[in-house]
Amino acid sequence: MVNVRFYRNYGKTFKKPRRPYEKERLDAELKLVGEYGLRCKRELWRVQYTLSRIRNAARELLTLDEKNPRRIFEGEALLRRMNRYGLLDETQNKLDYVLALTVENFLERRLQTIVFKSGMAKSIHHARVLIRQRHIRVGRQLVNIPSFMVRVESQKHVDFSLTSPFGGGRPGRVKRRNERAGAKKASGGDGDEDDEE
């Protein structure tokens, strides 16, 4: 019997560009990486790969006849998914709108961007740090993945986690130290040299 220790997913999640040194592409990628606070180009390529697969699916469905049951069923499912993630409006219920989607539409729906746009973080990079340090929750679920795609109905539930000092949970390290020092002085004991500094 084969002992399987690790299950590996061999599916590709991103695709490298064919030509590595294209000035226009490099400049455009750098602008997006800076604007949306991505860690590396691979994060951008991952979004581009997802978008290309969705557009290919839409293109394939558009080749079928309008009355084709497969086109109706799969097309509606694809549009429903795009609406759920806020990539398309409720009014945009045609497959042609899927072909018009851009990388920016996807990057706008990332948790990192939404945390920054909602004013919870000082910058896009600060938003990433808050998410990685487990300060952000979506509904009841604590999420520490900056690339988490936020659904439309979940967007109003993005908030600081219950244990986070930012959300009024457990006080932070400095605040706890100051509270201890204040309690010592109130009880009459003179504070340590550390508290004087």
From Swiss-Prot:
Residues 109-183 form the S4 RNA-binding domain. It comes from the Eukaryota. SUPFAM superfamilies: Alpha-L RNA-binding motif. Residues 161-197 are annotated as: Disordered. One of its GO terms (biological process) is translation. Binds to the translation initiation factors TIF3E1. InterPro entries: Ribosomal_uS4, Ribosomal_uS4_CS, Ribosomal_uS4_euk/arc, Ribosomal_uS4_N, S4_RNA-bd, S4_RNA-bd_sf. Belongs to the universal ribosomal protein uS4 family. Keywords: Ribonucleoprotein, Ribosomal protein, RNA-binding, rRNA-binding. The gene is RPS9C. The keyword Acetylation does not apply. This is Small ribosomal subunit protein uS4y. GO terms for molecular function: mRNA binding; rRNA binding; structural constituent of ribosome. PANTHER family: 30S 40S RIBOSOMAL PROTEIN, SMALL RIBOSOMAL SUBUNIT PROTEIN US4Y.
